[in-house]
C-alpha cells in the first residue's frame, strides 16, 4: 500500500485526568442548556461570529477526507423572505397532505405548524448542503464517500459552536428542499441537508416542556 504523506501531530495541552474530567463535565453541562428555539429576536449577530462557528464545523472528520459539506450563510432580508415563502408552501403541503396522522401526533407536543416567521425574523439562516458527487474542472463526476454521515458530524459541531457562542438555533427541514438550490444558486450536485436558523431568543421566549433521555437509556459501557 502506498504510504501517504504525513506530518507530525500538533502537540496538545498537557492535562491531568482531573483537568480532562473537568473540561468534559463543563462542556456536557453547557450543552444540556441548549434548546431548540422557534421564537427569535431580530437582534443582529456579527458576521465574524458566524464565520468562526463555520470554521469549527469545517474541522469535522469526513469519509476519505473529502469534506462534502457546503454552507451558505444568509442575512439578506430579501433572500430570507424568498426562503420563507418557499418553505411555507412546502410546509402547507406537508401538514395538509403529506404527513401521516402518527407524524402529526408526534409534532403536537412541539406546537409546530406551517407558519415559519422565524425564517425572516432571525438574523441568520445557514443552509447546509452535502455533495452527492464531486465535479472536476472537466465536468467529470467523482464519488463522495459517506456524505450524509460527514455532513451530519459537521452540522453537530456547528450547532455546538453556535451554542458556545451564546446563540440559539433551530434545525428546519422542509421537504422537499430543492427550492434552496434555486434561490441560492447552488449546483445540482449539492443536495440540501437542512436549514439552520440562528440568532438570539426573543424576550420572554418559551420552549416546550420536554425532557431528554438519561444517559443509561442511550449509552452503555462494556
Predicted regions located by residue number:
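Small-aliphatic-rich amphipathic alpha-helix that forms the alpha element of a beta-alpha
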Residues: 34, 55-57, 126, 132-183
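Short, electropositive alpha-helical surface patch
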Residues: 180-193
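C-terminal helix-cap and adjacent tail motif
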Residues: 1-23, 113, 191-222
Amino acid at each position: 500500500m502506498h504510504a501517504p504523506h504525513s506530518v507530525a501531530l500538533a502537540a496538545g495541552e498537557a492535562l491531568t485526568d482531573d483537568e480532562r474530567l473537568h473540561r468534559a463535565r463543563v462542556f456536557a453541562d453547557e450543552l444540556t442548556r441548549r434548546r431548540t428555539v422557534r421564537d427569535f429576536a431580530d437582534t443582529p449577530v456579527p458576521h465574524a461570529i458566524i464565520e468562526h462557528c463555520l470554521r469549527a464545523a469545517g474541522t469535522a472528520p469526513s469519509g476519505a477526507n473529502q469534506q462534502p459539506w457546503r454552507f451558505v450563510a444568509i442575512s439578506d432580508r430579501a433572500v430570507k423572505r424568498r426562503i420563507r415563502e418557499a418553505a411555507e408552501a412546502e410546509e402547507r403541503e406537508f401538514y395538509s397532505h403529506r404527513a401521516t396522522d402518527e407524524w402529526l401526533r408526534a409534532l403536537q407536543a412541539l406546537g409546530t405548524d406551517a407558519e415559519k416567521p422565524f425564517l425572516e425574523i432571525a438574523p441568520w439562516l445557514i443552509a447546509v448542503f452535502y455533495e452527492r458527487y464531486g465535479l472536476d474542472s472537466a465536468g467529470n463526476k467523482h464519488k463522495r464517500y459517506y456524505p450524509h454521515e460527514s455532513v451530519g458530524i459537521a452540522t453537530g459541531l456547528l450547532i455546538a459552536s453556535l451554542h458556545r457562542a451564546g446563540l440559539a438555533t433551530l434545525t428546519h427541514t422542509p421537504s422537499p428542499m430543492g427550492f434552496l438550490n434555486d434561490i441560492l444558486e447552488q449546483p445540482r450536485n449539492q443536495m440540501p441537508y437542512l436549514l439552520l436558523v440562528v440568532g438570539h431568543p426573543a424576550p420572554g421566549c418559551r420552549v416546550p416542556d420536554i425532557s431528554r433521555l438519561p444517559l443509561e437509556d442511550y449509552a452503555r459501557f462494556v
